């Protein structure tokens, strides 16, 4: 049969000629027809039927629906499309720099919901490959075009190939908390703790955290480091304010441990500061030498912290400072102090002139 229409000028045109598919002893009783091009029509009709009949015409049309947008393929549902994506586990080759979106049936759309490691797969689909192979969990949002309904997929595992391959028998990743995200070493050499005498930094913004690091390092090791602004040099911890790549972020950093120096780089002072905490923890693991190797480190979770209830029992300010300093050591970034359960409005705070009248604030 033909699908014909009357356009806005009153002219009759053929939109599509269609031949139905045999099914059993007859033909499919539900068909979806997609036009090659969009049309604007005042009227639409089916005509020029070619019927198969023994003694009578046997064509009947129960219902015809016309849509201005693509409809889902028969048999495809929002749930089935989501399940199909969840069933896929993929490997992203080392030469791929943009995430390939899943293919979905006509009538559905899909967009990236996010990855657990945004420092490897960014919100825009940009990929920065890790040092060695790493599993990244990715989620999508699938939308049914006809209804506008959407559904998130579960996390789908993607193996993102690394830029390097770790060989057996080389230096192991330092043990720190939280675990270093990426590590690579092609060496068995070490750098002696005693050989590191200086700290350099490239930007005045780093001075405060460098001074804190010098103080902390002396507390940990007994070694008094000399800090100075300038470029990287041998026998030194060298801190640089620059972006190692597009996705590492303010809290991420790279560390290159060489035979005669340790270089740390981050786009922000925070990342450099976290690199310093890693060095302090590395000393706790081995107080004589550091393993030569490279790391690319970053947090998995944006907020990492806890609530400290200091309302039930008084806690000294020094104690709270010690708690927050320990948090920094473990790269935690969110501290909330619960000070009081008193339900007192601000304007009633000073209602009583004397200390023994404090409870008047509740009145």
Task: Give the location of each predicted region.
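Feature activates predominantly on carbohydrate-active enzymes
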Residues: 248-363
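Short beta-strand/loop motifs in extracellular/secreted proteins, especially
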Residues: 1, 42, 108-110, 335
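Beta-rich interaction/scaffold domains
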Residues: 72-167
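Surface-exposed loop/turn motifs at beta-strand-loop junctions within extracellular Ig-like
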Residues: 50-52, 140-146, 268
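Acidic, contiguous N-terminal accessory segments
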Residues: 159-270, 274-296
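Aromatic, loop-rich ligand-recognition surfaces of beta-strand-rich domains
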Residues: 1-14, 27-73
């Amino acid at each position: 049969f033909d699908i014909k229409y009357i356009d806005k000028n009153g002219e009759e045109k053929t939109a599509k000629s269609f031949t139905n598919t045999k099914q059993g002893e007859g033909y499919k009783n539900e068909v979806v027809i997609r036009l090659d091009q969009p049309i604007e029509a005042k009227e639409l009709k089916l005509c020029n039927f070619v019927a198969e009949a023994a003694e009578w015409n046997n064509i009947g049309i129960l219902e015809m629906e016309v849509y201005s947008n693509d409809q889902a393929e028969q048999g495809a549902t929002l749930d089935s499309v989501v399940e199909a994506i969840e069933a896929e586990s993929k490997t992203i080759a080392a030469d791929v720099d943009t995430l390939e979106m899943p293919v979905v049936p006509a009538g559905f759309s899909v967009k990236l919901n996010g990855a657990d490691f945004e420092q490897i797969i960014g919100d825009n689909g940009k990929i920065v490959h890790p040092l060695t192979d790493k599993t990244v969990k990715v989620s999508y949002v699938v939308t049914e075009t006809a209804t506008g309904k959407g559904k998130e997929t579960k996390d789908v595992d993607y193996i993102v190939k690394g830029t390097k391959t770790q060989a057996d028998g080389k230096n192991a990743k330092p043990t720190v908390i939280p675990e270093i995200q990426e590590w690579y070493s092609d060496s068995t050499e070490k750098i002696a703790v005693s050989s590191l005498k200086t700290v350099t930094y490239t930007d005045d913004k780093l001075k405060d955290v460098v001074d804190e690091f010098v103080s902390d390092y002396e507390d940990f090791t007994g070694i008094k480091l000399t800090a100075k602004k300038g470029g990287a040099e041998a026998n030194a911890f060298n801190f640089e304010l620059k972006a190692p790549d597009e996705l590492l972020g303010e809290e991420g950093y790279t560390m290159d441990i060489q035979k005669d120096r340790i270089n740390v780089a981050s786009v922000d002072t925070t990342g450099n500061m976290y690199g310093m905490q890693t060095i302090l923890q590395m000393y706790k693991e081995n107080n004589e030498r550091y393993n030569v190797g490279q790391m690319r480190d970053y947090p998995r979770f944006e907020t990492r912290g806890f609530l400290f209830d200091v309302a039930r029992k008084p806690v000294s300010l020094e104690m709270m400072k010690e708690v927050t300093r320990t948090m920094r050591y473990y790269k935690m970034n969110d501290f909330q102090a619960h000070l009081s359960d008193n339900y007192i409005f601000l304007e009633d705070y000073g209602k009583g002139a004397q200390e023994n009248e404090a409870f008047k604030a509740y009145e």
